[in-house]
Regions:
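Glycine-centered, phosphate/nucleic-acid-interacting loop/turn motifs that mediate DNA/RNA or nucleotide
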Residues: 65
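Key DNA-contact positions within bacterial/archaeal DNA-binding proteins
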Residues: 52, 107
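N-terminal helix-turn-helix DNA-binding core of bacterial DNA-binding proteins
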Residues: 16-49
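Short, small-residue-biased leader/transition segments that mark boundaries at the very start
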Residues: 1-5
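Basic, amphipathic "hinge/linker" alpha-helix immediately C-terminal to the N-terminal HTH DNA-binding motif
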Residues: 73-91
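C-terminal regulatory/oligomerization modules of transcriptional regulators
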Residues: 10-12, 111-135
C-alpha cells in the first residue's frame, strides 16, 4: 500500500506541476498579446503571485526549453512553449464558451475551464470542439 500511495502522490504532484507550468505559459501568451515585453513582475501581477515564486517557475520553464529570458529580463515563449500555451488557451476559451452556453455564470465557467483544460484528453476536447462548431 505504501508504494501505491507514493506513486499516486507523485502522479498528483507531477500533474499539478504540469498544470502550474501550463498556467504560466498561458499567462505569458496572454500578456505577450497585451504588452510590448513580458517580465516576471508582469506575470506576478497578473497571477497575484510573489515575484520570487514566479522567478522559480521561470527557471523551470527555461530548463524545459519552454521560454527564453533575455539579459534585460524579457520573457519569450519558445516554439514548444508557444504550442503548449496556445493549446491551453484554445481549450480555456472553448470550454468557457461551452459552459456559458449551458447557462453557467461567466466567472464560474472561466474557473471551471481553467481546471478542466489541463486534464481533458485530446479526443474529448476535439469532440467538444466539433460539437460546439456545429451549433
Amino acid at each position: 500500500l505504501g508504494d501505491v500511495y507514493k506513486r499516486q502522490l507523485t502522479g498528483v504532484f507531477e500533474m499539478r506541476n504540469n498544470e502550474s507550468s501550463e498556467n504560466y505559459l498561458e499567462t505569458i501568451l496572454i500578456l505577450s498579446k497585451k504588452l510590448p515585453v513580458v517580465r516576471s513582475v508582469d506575470i506576478a501581477n497578473e497571477l497575484g503571485f510573489k515575484k520570487s515564486s514566479v522567478s522559480i517557475a521561470m527557471k523551470n520553464l527555461r530548463e524545459k526549453n519552454n521560454i527564453t529570458v533575455s539579459d534585460a529580463g524579457f520573457i519569450t515563449l519558445t516554439e514548444s512553449g508557444r504550442q503548449i500555451a496556445e493549446m491551453i488557451y484554445e481549450r480555456h476559451e472553448l470550454l468557457s464558451e461551452c459552459l456559458e452556453k449551458l447557462g453557467v455564470d461567466k466567472e464560474i465557467a472561466a474557473e471551471d475551464a481553467c481546471r478542466i483544460e489541463h486534464v481533458i484528453s485530446p479526443e474529448s476536447f476535439e469532440a467538444i470542439k466539433k460539437h460546439i462548431h456545429k451549433s
